[in-house]
Curated annotation (Swiss-Prot):
This is Transposase for insertion sequence element IS200. Belongs to the IS200/IS605 insertion sequence (IS) element family. InterPro entries: Transposase_17, Transposase_17_sf. Transposase responsible for transposition of the IS200 insertion sequence (IS) element. Transposition occurs in 2 main steps, excision from the donor DNA 'top strand' into a single strand circle and its subsequent reinsertion into the DNA target. This increases the copy number of the IS.
């Protein structure tokens, strides 16, 4: 039971596996942008007292294992996280406004799952997610020619 936290009259252990992606599932996170989105998300979680247990920024989506206090709903936190990070990314990278209109950097939805006793398994899954994505890309068979004309 060592995972429990406490508020004034509450003992809690609320962990969530959250996955969200940029609009149009574009592969946007490489190099400097990958580091920037990581530091922005860390900063925003810190401001709301949300603890990041594990996180991975893949090329076209982000996995996070978070401890969100029960006084805050997951949907309100995700609205805050995606909204503020979008503004901060647009401020830092001016070229994003040409790819994404109306300052909407993230997809509208997200995936969330509660984490029970299998925290270690989900942490391991998130830790190795980037490697699995790369393996999936390598499994695709390159076609030497044009798929439409059949010529090389």
């Amino acid at each position: 039971m060592g995972d429990e936290k406490s508020l004034a009259h509450t003992r809690w252990n609320c962990k969530y596996h959250i996955v969200f992606a940029p609009k149009y599932r574009r592969q946007a996170f490489y190099g400097e942008k990958r580091r920037a989105v990581g530091s922005i998300l860390r900063k925003l979680c810190e401001w709301k007292n949300v603890r990041i247990l594990e996180a991975e920024c893949c090329a076209d989506h982000i996995h996070m294992l978070l401890e969100i206090p029960p006084k805050m709903s997951v949907s309100s936190f995700m609205g805050y996280l995606k909204g503020k990070s979008s503004l901060m990314l647009y401020e830092q990278f001016g070229d994003l406004k040409f790819k994404y209109r109306n300052r909407e950097f993230w997809c509208r939805g997200y995936y969330v799952d509660t984490v029970g006793k299998n925290t270690a398994k989900i942490q391991d899954y998130i830790k190795h997610q980037l490697e699995e994505d790369k393996m999936g890309e390598q499994l695709s068979i390159p076609y030497p020619g044009s798929p439409f004309t059949g010529r090389k």
